[in-house]
Amino acid sequence: METRASLRGVRLSAQKGRLVADLVRGKPVGQALNILAFCPKKGAGIVKKVLESAIANAEHNDGADIDELTVKTIYVEKGMVLKRFTARAKGRGNRIIKPTCHIYLTVGN
């Protein structure tokens, strides 16, 4: 049985999120949590929260054994982009792009 968890609108670029997602794809959840706990990237903490949510969903909703769960699928999609302006010299302005992403994770036996 498979259980899903998702987090949408995360203030992280999809490219940086995919770097972290590739670290835990296909791993047992205990090992994946250990990898994410010691990964220095910003996205690691975010993915860890999603993984913990998926584990809690599997345990509460499906009565799954945590020791048998693995990360079946994890993918990071591009979300909306926040566009901001910053002041520059001589009355000009530059655009600042603040990307977001959506993280989807599935755990199962």
From Swiss-Prot:
GO terms for molecular function: rRNA binding; structural constituent of ribosome. Keywords: Ribonucleoprotein, Ribosomal protein, RNA-binding, rRNA-binding. PROSITE patterns: RIBOSOMAL_L22. The keyword ATP-binding does not apply. It comes from the Bacteria. GO terms for biological process: translation. SUPFAM superfamilies: Ribosomal protein L22. One of its GO terms (cellular component) is cytosolic large ribosomal subunit. The keyword Ribonucleoprotein applies. Belongs to the universal ribosomal protein uL22 family. NCBIfam families: rplV_bact. HAMAP family: Ribosomal_uL22_B (MF_01331_B). This protein binds specifically to 23S rRNA; its binding is stimulated by other ribosomal proteins, e.g. L4, L17, and L20. It is important during the early stages of 50S assembly. It makes multiple contacts with different domains of the 23S rRNA in the assembled 50S subunit and ribosome. The globular domain of the protein is located near the polypeptide exit tunnel on the outside of the subunit, while an extended beta-hairpin is found that lines the wall of the exit tunnel in the center of the 70S ribosome. Part of the 50S ribosomal subunit. This is Large ribosomal subunit protein uL22. It comes from Dechloromonas aromatica (strain RCB). The gene is rplV.
